[in-house]
């Protein structure tokens, strides 16, 4: 059934009427008072293109699976981010390129040197995904991404098992989604030193320009082993060992290898519980100076909580369970790369055996966290959305860490309670990033009639046919950290929800990252699976 929605942008309403492409019959109309477009004969509408007319013309398609292709492309974005292998047809789907950054000759930075691997030791750390708009690879961000990735799979196994991505591994007897994830997991495992610690990132000393990856000439380093990075690897591999267990015939030995590596990492972190990445201080002590993304995090309690949780769910060793419960923070905080506690809490909600009371307390905290946003959506929101109703909603990466993640929280709440109120509000969050916002942009490249054309994304820059499709960009940012840099100039006197530029140098509003894209596909897939 076609639902009625108000055709308005929050400031004024419009007079619309809709036509079917089949026979030009009027299917519905809206008045200039903010009315709803309702079909005259809803039972007769079927999947086909339709057109809305006002001063201009806009076309749309009625589809029984409106989010299917969006989900597919949001997942395929990770394939486009692959390092060390060529992106070739037929998998490239119009965006072929040679391999970039083989990373088989990576140097150990002085900050990461040990007796066994002294400074400038050469190691191989090939594979994985480019992290964002740059050409580097960061463990803390990758770990969070893999957590959301694999937890989404666990929630909708049957759905993902039938989702075809058209990637080189599509012929393997394993879901395409898991095959894509494995490409990054294998790289993450190469970032573990022989003592169990994990390098914080693999990077050039400073950012490359907007050039083709094959043109990059700067040396690449693995940098300082840190507690958060090590625990993120421990959690990721423990989770992966559990998820990939049915596919031992495809990845022989992986489960045992991942389990051992996860335990080794956790023990290293317990022996080194407070080694954090402080880039300015590091650069005072070691050369060359590193000025790429810091992903600095000065509290590892949340990472200990997540790693111990995943190790318990894998091994059922009560030692890990007891340690996990001890690490659980008192305050409920939405998950980001820098605070992964909610990932652990969600796992306990979904696997409550032996900790029923604790799981119920965590679930109550989730629902209490969502309650004011949902009430606002239902009573005091221009777009009837649980996101985007106050200036503080618009920050660096808000489309993901604010909007899409809130939608994912709503999906988990729906799964846990069966209350459709949460499902409705998850969709409202997606509506925001797809265009129901103050800018009018669909914030996903390649989708909609008004989407970003100049993302801060080096890979997209190499294609004359426009940006790579399926990438969520960061979105409006009231802090405008890039204002006045490299030609970035924001209009004066615009509100926080309009502080956005579709301009390549605008890294504060127009960049892409793997951790943002994982929330886009997890949200769209969760909604598509309900169709």
Predicted regions and their residues:
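Aromatic (Trp/Tyr) and acidic
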Residues: 1-19, 23-40, 49-52, 81-143, ...
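Hydrophobic or amphipathic alpha-helical targeting/insertion segments
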Residues: 45-71
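Long, well-ordered core segments of solenoidal/helical folds
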Residues: 65-86, 90, 177-196, 259-278, ...
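Glycine-rich, acidic and aromatic/proline-enriched surface loops and short helix-turn segments
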Residues: 144-155, 187, 194, 230-243, ...
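Short coil/linker segments at helix-helix boundaries
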Residues: 151-183, 215-221, 239-259
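Surface-exposed helix-capping loop/turn segments at secondary-structure junctions
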Residues: 155-162, 193-198, 243-251, 272-282, ...
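C-terminal transactivation domains of fungal Zn(2)-Cys(6)
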Residues: 236-295, 309, 349, 353-357
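Surface-exposed intrinsically disordered loops and tails
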Residues: 282, 286-288, 387-388, 488-493
């Amino acid at each position: 059934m076609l639902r009625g929605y108000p055709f308005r942008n929050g400031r004024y309403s419009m007079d619309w009427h809709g036509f079917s492409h089949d026979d030009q019959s009027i299917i519905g109309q809206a008045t200039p008072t903010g009315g709803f477009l309702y079909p005259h004969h809803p039972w007769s509408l079927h999947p086909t293109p339709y057109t809305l007319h006002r001063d201009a013309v806009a076309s749309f398609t009625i589809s029984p699976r409106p989010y299917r292709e969006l989900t597919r492309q949001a997942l395929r974005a990770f394939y486009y981010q692959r390092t060390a292998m060529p992106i070739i047809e037929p998998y490239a789907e119009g965006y072929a390129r040679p391999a970039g950054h083989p990373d088989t000759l990576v140097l150990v930075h002085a900050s990461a040197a040990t007796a066994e691997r002294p400074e400038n030791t050469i190691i191989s750390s090939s594979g994985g995904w480019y992290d964002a708009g740059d050409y580097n690879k960061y463990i803390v961000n990758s770990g969070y991404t893999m957590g959301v990735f694999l937890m989404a799979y666990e929630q909708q196994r049957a759905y993902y098992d039938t989702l075809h991505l058209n990637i080189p591994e599509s012929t393997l007897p394993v879901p395409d989604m898991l095959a894509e994830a494995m490409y990054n997991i294998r790289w993450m495992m190469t970032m573990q030193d022989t003592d169990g610690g994990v390098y914080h990132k693999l990077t050039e000393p400073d950012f490359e320009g907007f050039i083709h990856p094959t043109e990059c000439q700067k040396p690449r380093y693995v940098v300082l082993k840190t507690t958060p990075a090590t625990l993120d690897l421990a959690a990721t591999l423990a989770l992966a060992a559990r998820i990939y267990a049915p596919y031992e015939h495809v990845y022989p030995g992986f489960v045992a290898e991942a389990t051992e590596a996860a335990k080794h990492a956790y023990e290293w972190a317990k022996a080194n519980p407070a080694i954090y990445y402080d880039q300015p201080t590091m650069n005072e002590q070691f050369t060359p100076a590193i000025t790429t993304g810091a992903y600095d995090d000065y509290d590892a309690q949340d990472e200990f909580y997540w790693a111990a949780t995943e190790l318990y769910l894998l091994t059922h060793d009560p030692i890990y369970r007891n340690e996990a419960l001890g690490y659980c923070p008192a305050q409920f905080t939405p998950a980001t790369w820098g605070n992964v506690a909610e990932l652990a809490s969600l796992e306990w909600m979904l696997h409550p055996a032996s900790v029923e009371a604790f799981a119920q307390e965590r679930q109550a905290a989730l629902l209490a966290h969502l309650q004011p946003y949902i009430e606002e959506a239902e009573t005091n929101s221009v777009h009837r959305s649980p996101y985007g109703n106050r200036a503080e909603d618009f920050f660096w990466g808000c489309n993901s860490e604010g909007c899409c993640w809130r939608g994912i929280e709503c999906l988990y709440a729906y799964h846990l309670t069966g209350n459709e109120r949460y499902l409705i509000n998850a969709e409202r969050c997606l509506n925001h990033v797809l265009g129901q916002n103050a800018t009018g942009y669909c914030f996903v490249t390649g989708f909609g009639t008004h989407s970003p054309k100049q993302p801060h994304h080096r890979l997209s820059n190499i294609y004359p046919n426009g940006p790579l499709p399926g990438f969520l960009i960061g979105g409006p940012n009231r802090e405008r950290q890039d204002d006045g840099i490299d030609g970035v100039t924001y209009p004066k006197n615009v509100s926080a929800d309009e502080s956005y530029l579709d301009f390549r140098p605008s890294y504060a509003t127009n960049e892409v990252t793997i951790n943002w894209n994982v929330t886009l596909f997890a949200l769209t897939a969760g909604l598509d699976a309900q169709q």
